[in-house]
Amino acid sequence: MSSNTASSSAGAAGSGDSSAARKNSKRPKYSKFTQQELPACKPILTPGWVISTFLIVSVIFIPLGVISLFASQDVVEIVDRYDTECIPAPARTNKVAYIQGDGDKVCNRDLKVTKRMKQPIYVYYQLENFYQNHRRYVKSRSDSQLRSTKYENQISACKPEDDVGGQPIVPCGLIAWSLFNDTYALSRNNVSLAVNKKGIAWKSDKEHKFGNKVFPKNFQKGNITGGATLDPRIPLSEQEDLIVWMRTAALPTFRKLYGKIESDLEMGDTIHVKLNNNYNTYSFNGKKKLVLSTTSWLGGKNDFLGIAYLTVGGICFILALAFTIMYLVKPRRLGDPSYLSWNRNPGGR
């Protein structure tokens, strides 16, 4: 009786130990995923597959490249660099002093239309060597202040353009302070060409990032004026030049939309531009350009996409041709294990 009791006690203890071991085990629950036993496909890259793949890529990419280049060639673009030409010859030895000085800085430029331009014609200003992506510059703004009057005093990130005499600047920060302030007045045959400045900003920016009850306050009233001024009677959501400028560029050369011409320009037309050369790009060796451009279904003029497609397609075609020649001239045995030396001659070394 006692032996039975002892054996049952030992059995109970053993089962308890095994269950405890199972409970304390760190072995993960078995699954094909954790044990890397999922079904997999390992294609054998035979010459036929490799050549066919390169040919398919080339057949797709080369036509896409040609289509993209044709679309880019349909875009008519006029680019005029004026930053140097709009400085009087005697003042070109010290351009910074000229642009910072008082006086009229009106400049007249004539642009020749070499090909018919259908409306809408987009007017851009292009800046070069201007690093809007600089960390300190990008962070110098207050998005909450731009959206609502409740956050008017949230200006800690905007230094040094945060306040004037203890009163907050709206909009604050270096981005708004450096707002582009060159202006363009276009005419053709002594008839003014209207440049529509409505609808140049993103709708999402106007509706969600700039409040319709937030008005400029103390803007450009510091010791140094950075760029354009803002009408204090117009809410920020309607100041589209500011909204366009506040969407910072990723690269040092960029274009920003100035307005739209909503009439066609014929080949041979001469566009007279009366511009105010106010913006100081001379202190950092920057460049300023005025751009008139049409668009295509692919966007503005940009040959890069077409060239990239053609380059990839051409490389794939050359590789397909090279592999075909190699396969026909000097074919290689299939990579089958049966061709391994120790399989073909098991007894050999």
Curated annotation (Swiss-Prot):
Subcellular location: Golgi apparatus membrane; Prevacuolar compartment membrane; Endoplasmic reticulum membrane
Membrane topology of the entry: Multi-pass membrane protein
TM annotation in the entry: 50-70, 305-325
GO CC, one annotated term: Golgi membrane
Family matches, as InterPro entries: CDC50/LEM3_fam (IPR005045)
Glycosylated residues in this chain: 181, 190, 223
Annotated region described as Disordered, given as residue ranges: 1-30
Tissue: Expressed in roots, leaves, stems, flowers and siliques.
Record keywords: Acetylation, Endoplasmic reticulum, Glycoprotein, Golgi apparatus, Membrane, Transmembrane, Transmembrane helix
Low complexity bias spans: 1-21
One Pfam family this sequence matches: CDC50
Sites bearing N-acetylserine, chain numbering: 2
Function description: Required for the lipid transport activity of the ALA/ALIS P4-ATPase complex.
Family, similarity comment: Belongs to the CDC50/LEM3 family.
Assembly, per entry: Interacts with ALA2 and ALA3 in a heterologous system.
UniProt protein name: ALA-interacting subunit 3
Organism: Arabidopsis thaliana (Mouse-ear cress)
